[in-house]
Amino acid sequence: MLSITEEIKNKGRDIGFHKIGIANPHIAYQDNAVSNLQGWLSSGYQADMTWMDNPKRFDITQCMPDIQSVITVALNYYTPHQHSSNSRYGKVSRYAWGKDYHKVLSQKLKLFCKWLNNRGIKTTCYVDTGPIQEKVWAERSGVGWIAKNGNVITKEFGSWVFLGVVLTNLSLTSDTPHAKYCGTCRKCLDICPTKAIVHPFVVDSRRCIAYNTIENRSNDFPEYIKNNLNGWIAGCDLCQDVCPWNKRFSKETNIQDFYPQPGNISLDLKEISNLTEIQWQQKFSSSSLKRIKVKAWRRNAKANL
């Protein structure tokens, strides 16, 4: 007979999660997650992302007082498409080519949580929207490891994965935390044109092209960002594209929702520089790119022209 832990993992795989792991929230891990976050915040590396200092991020029991286990799941989103080499087009980060990953992953998590709830198990789930250190729990649950560029790398799919977290009041058998396999490699640090990876495992959002093109709401970019965009209009994949794990282990996803929507890989810079509210709604309504508002789209495009 299968244990409840294996039964839950099998159900997660049946629903379509490519990886699933479990961690115990009540043991002392040796990853310095709390002090690392505190140091990152005190250095100002969060820029204006004020939600990053939510106290719940330091103590997961504040999200569920009776928590007994943390389940982390991952979905592979890689497709082999490539950006246009034509300089008139701006580049979009791979994560945003398809349907909004929040919706895709949330649908699967809701099915998973409903199945658990029907067995009397309490759950709370998050998809990049709550005060949870998803990457930390992914490493603790054996799903992957936090790399030098701050992304989670899995042995099976590289770093092209979306993460979801389920908190539960059921005590389950934990997986072994994942070891780090970056070794002495520093390709991600060396490729970054703005030196946003200030040292291994620490990213200064203020210098990150992805942060600036997606989260930065200011009217203009600092010169060190503007001069190094190199066509990036929404996000940046440079530190992932050079990663040896991605070059070797990227696998095409079996989730059709993650395949590129028409025109989402590369965008005409002149068109985007004159984007209207109606065009924005029509083009990005089903995409995670809708997080970038019209004014920011125009700014991003003009900075590349």
UniProtKB/Swiss-Prot annotation:
Q: What is this protein called?
A: Epoxyqueuosine reductase
Annotated EC? 1.17.99.6
**Which terms in the Gene Ontology molecular function aspect does this entry carry?**
4 iron, 4 sulfur cluster binding; epoxyqueuosine reductase activity; metal ion binding
Q: Which PANTHER family match?
A: EPOXYQUEUOSINE REDUCTASE
Recorded superkingdom: Bacteria
- Describe the subunit structure: Monomer.
Q: Which InterPro entries match?
A: 4Fe4S_Fe-S-bd, 4Fe4S_Fe_S_CS, QueG, QueG_DUF1730
Where found in the cell? Cytoplasm
Family per UniProt? Belongs to the QueG family.
Q: Where is the 4Fe-4S ferredoxin-type domain?
A: 170-202
Can you quote a single GO CC term? cytoplasm
Q: Which PROSITE patterns does this one have?
A: 4FE4S_FER_1, 4FE4S_FER_2
Its keywords, alphabetically, are:
4Fe-4S, Cytoplasm, Iron, Iron-sulfur, Metal-binding, Oxidoreductase, Queuosine biosynthesis, tRNA processing
Q: Which parts of the sequence bind [4Fe-4S] cluster 2?
A: C192, C208, C236, C239
